[in-house]
Amino acid sequence: MNKVALITGASSGIGMETAKLLVTKGYTVYAAARRVERMQELEKAGVHILKMDVTDEASMVDGVNKILAAENRIDVLVNNAGYGSYGALEEVPLSEARYQFEVNIFGLARLTQLVLPKMREQHSGRIINISSIGGKIGEPHGTWYHATKYAVEGLSDSLRMELKQFGIDVVIIEPGAIKTEWTDIARNNMLKVSGKGPYKNLVEKHARMYERADKSGANPLVVAQTIVDSILADKPKTRYATGGGAKMILFMRRILSDRGFDKLLLGMMK
């Protein structure tokens, strides 16, 4: 019997590439997203498509129930759905900040709650949480986004210890700069929210840095390969930094003081 995986945020980028790759490894793959009209390519590859919004309780419950009704098992959950909306903390509406938490942390946590009873029953399973190097470092104008990713890191580290007794692994993936829609969304929101007020000067420099990073960013397939490697590993690492200078940036964060790293990052914004 094939193992069964659920991947969220699979209508593009990392999620889509992970679904395409994992189905070639003999997994039964369910790819979930809001924009299912963009997922015909996955369907042709043999991936099952689910319409799911990780901010909607009924949508998540229905999706998991459909998988369990069809397969009676779930072996892997890849919590990939994510949202980044940048802007100075002073200027980002709290409604927007809350929405980022709904997508990036509460949706992730709720979907994990929904799959855990079956994984415990199986005494096996793997939860793959897509964090970011932004769960280990901060940037100006990314206060709310980084807060969500720091939360993903803390949640995952605690959950890993809770679930060890049930034979369930928890893995954190920390991508660096990747060529996906995420960068454009974050940059455009940052300019819209904070590109004309008191933060304008640094925001414009930050936006230019993102343009450069987008051109040199890694292909989403690099991260997808790391995710699939973590799924196939007999004993996965607890976290994987991957793509887009991730390992170098995290190394610099470890060796520099807080202010030293601030200086390095601000110096890249020009």
Language-model segments: which ranges?
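A glycine-rich helix->loop->beta "capping" turn
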Residues: 66-79, 85
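C-terminal beta-strand-loop-alpha-helix "lid" module of Rossmann-like NAD(P)-dependent dehydrogenases
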Residues: 164-214
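Active-site helix of classical SDR
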Residues: 112, 148-151
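Conserved glycine-rich cofactor-binding loop
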Residues: 11-12
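Residue(s) in the substrate-gating loop at a strand-loop-helix junction
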Residues: 132
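The beta1-alpha1 cofactor-binding region of Rossmann-like NAD(H)/NADP(H)-dependent oxidoreductases
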Residues: 52-62, 94
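Substrate-binding pocket helix/loop in short-chain dehydrogenase/reductase
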Residues: 88-89, 96-98
